[in-house]
């Protein structure tokens, strides 16, 4: 039986971590993907290495089309794919580190979330944070997706605080944020 709120929180975290580890299948789960017409002929998302966490996503532009991203400009790039995720999972859309380092290209909504009940095309919102125009062509690896479990919670409202002595029942952080714990 937990003695404090901190003990209860720690027990909840340990139980959650244990359930995630024990629920990992011995075989990889299958991600069903539907290709749209403009996604035909492109490689399906795949892991670049045995230890990769993300599956590469490619631009599903037409052969004749090139999207030029000027510095500061953003564009929504189609992948030509619809994900059919299992309930209890999401697909996170993340930038590719090489594009960010070499060209300043990143995903604007990071990580983007594809919910398990979404059945539209997966698109990637890219922005050019670099100094030069960047050309996006058909088949380019533009982002990566990580499939992750989702923990849904029950939400309950707390009563308003009655006085200063009950404001911080766990820890001493209070309402501090955005660098309030230090800058080193």
Curated annotation (Swiss-Prot):
Superkingdom of this protein's organism: Bacteria
Cofactor: Mg(2+)
UniProt cross-references to SUPFAM superfamilies, sorted A to Z: dUTPase-like
Chain residue ranges for the region called Disordered: 1-25, 165-184
Function comment: This enzyme is involved in nucleotide metabolism: it produces dUMP, the immediate precursor of thymidine nucleotides and it decreases the intracellular concentration of dUTP so that uracil cannot be incorporated into DNA.
Similarity comment: family membership: Belongs to the dUTPase family.
Protein name: Deoxyuridine 5'-triphosphate nucleotidohydrolase
Originating organism: Bartonella henselae (strain ATCC 49882 / DSM 28221 / CCUG 30454 / Houston 1)
Lineage, opening ranks: Bacteria, Pseudomonadati, Pseudomonadota, Alphaproteobacteria, Hyphomicrobiales
């Amino acid at each position: 039986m937990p003695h404090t709120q901190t003990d209860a929180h720690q027990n909840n975290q340990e139980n959650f971590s244990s359930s995630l580890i024990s629920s990992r299948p011995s075989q990889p789960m299958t991600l069903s993907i539907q290709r749209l017409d403009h996604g035909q002929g492109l490689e399906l998302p795949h892991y670049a290495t045995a230890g990769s966490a993300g599956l590469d996503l490619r631009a599903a532009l037409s052969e004749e089309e090139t999207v030029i991203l000027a510095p500061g400009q953003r564009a929504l790039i189609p992948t030509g794919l619809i994900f059919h995720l299992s309930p209890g999972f999401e697909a996170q859309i993340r930038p590719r580190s090489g594009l960010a380092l070499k060209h300043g290209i990143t995903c604007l909504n990071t990580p983007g979330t594809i919910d398990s009940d979404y059945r539209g095309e997966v698109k990637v919102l890219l922005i050019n944070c670099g100094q030069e125009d960047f050309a996006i062509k058909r088949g380019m690896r533009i982002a990566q997706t990580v499939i992750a479990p989702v923990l849904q919670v029950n939400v309950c409202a707390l009563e308003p605080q009655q006085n200063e002595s009950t404001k911080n029942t766990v820890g001493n952080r209070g309402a501090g944020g955005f660098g309030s714990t230090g800058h080193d």
